[in-house]
């Protein structure tokens, strides 16, 4: 059974660029037969986005300018293991998460 794996990268840290390079490397090497990979980027200012764009944009630090970003947060409910995403219609959708890999 394929698991939903959330890779979280970026953040308000002096290690921001290291996180981006590491995330790109991890994403290039994950086994897609075992994982449905979902990426969540955090800008230097602390904004959280679901990212569906190209891995090179992560490594080149231009991912947040991409139209493939959608505001998102992790569910604050301990029992609800999901990513909450604001869709184009202004409604919230949940994406179930099995594993979180912070980079």
Where does each model-flagged region fall?
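ATP-binding N-terminal substructure of ATP-dependent carboxylate-amine bond-forming enzymes
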Residues: 1-103
